[in-house]
Amino acid sequence: MREKIARKEALLVCGCGTGLIARLCDQAGVDLIGCYNTGRYRMNGIASIAGNLPIGNANEVMFDMAVKDILPVVKNTPVIGGIFGLDPTRDMQRFLKSCYDIGLSGVQGFPTIGKIGGQIRKEYEQVGFTFEKEVSVLAYARKLNMLTMSYCYSVDEAKMIADAGIDLIIPHMGMTTGGDNGTKEQSPIDVAAEKTEAIIQAALSINPEIIPLCHGGNISEPKDAEYIMHHTSAKGFVGASSIERIPTEKAIKNVCAGYRAIRL
C-alpha cells in the first residue's frame, strides 16, 4: 500500500456484503475487501445502520459471511473482517485467532461504540464498554500479524488509535447519503473535508506512519472521494454503500426499465 501511495495512487477498500460483489471487487483489483455485518443487511434491502441494532450478533454474522460467502470467491485481495471488540459473549483474543485461522488478513473495529453519542454513550462507558477497549482489541490483533483498521469519529479517538499503533485510520463522516436506504443529507463536502483532516492530523501527530483514508457522509461517488483526497491528507477511500448498494440500485432499475420499455 505504501508503494501505491508513493506512486500517487489512491487506495481503495471495498465493503462487500455478498460473494458476487466480493468477486467483482477482487477482479477489479481493489486493495482490500471488507466483510462486516452491515453488508448482510445492506445487500438484503435493509439500511446499513441496522448493523448497530441488537438484531444479530455482529461477530457471528461477519464470521459466517467470511467463511461461506466472501473468502471462498476472493482469489487475490486481502479480506478484512469487521469485529465488534466489546462483545461480552466471547473471548476476543480467541476470536481473533479464529479470524486469522480462517484466512482473514486483518480486522477493522466495526461495529463500534464510536458511532454512539450522548447519554447512552456515557452509560455504556460507565460499565466498561469504551472505545479505548475496542482499540486494545485491535492492538492485540497486530500481535497476530494482522492488518488493523479503525473508523474514527473524533480527535480524541484519533489519538487513541494512533497511540495503539493501528495501521489505518478512517475518519467517519456518517452514514452514506444517496440511494434508497441512505441518509438524505449530511455535512457539505467541504465541512467533511475539514473534519476529516482534523482527525487525520491528530493521528499523524502521534504516529506519522499511520495510513489515513476517508469514508461516509456525502463521500458517495468517485468525484467526492477525489475532492476529499485533494483537500486533506487522506490516501484513499473506504466504500461500502457507495460501492455495492447505490451502484446496484441504479443498475437494476435501469436494466428493468429497458426490458419494461419493450413493446409487442
Q: Which role does the model predict for each range below?
A:
Residues I21, A28, L32, I49-F131:
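Active-site beta->alpha loop and helix N-cap motifs at the rims of alpha/beta catalytic domains
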Residues L32-N44, D101-G117, L168-T183, H231-V255:
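Glycine-rich phosphate-binding active-site loops on the catalytic face of alpha/beta enzymes
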Residues L12-C16, I33-C35, V79-I83, V107-G109, ...:
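Hydrophobic faces of well-ordered beta-strands that scaffold small-molecule active sites
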Residues G17-G19, T38, G82-L86, T112-G114, ...:
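Active-site beta-loop-alpha junctions enriched in small/polar residues
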Residues T18-A28, T89-S98, S154-G165, G217-A234:
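Catalytic cores of alpha/beta
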Residues T112-S136, D156-Q186:
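Histidine/lysine/aspartate-rich catalytic loop segments that bind and position anionic ligands
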Residues I46-G81, E123-Y153, K184-P212, H231-T232, ...:
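Alpha-helix-loop-beta-strand connector modules within alpha/beta enzyme cores
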Residues M1-G15, R23-Q27, V67-N76, L264:
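N-terminal amphipathic alpha-helix/helix-capping segment at the start of soluble metabolic enzymes
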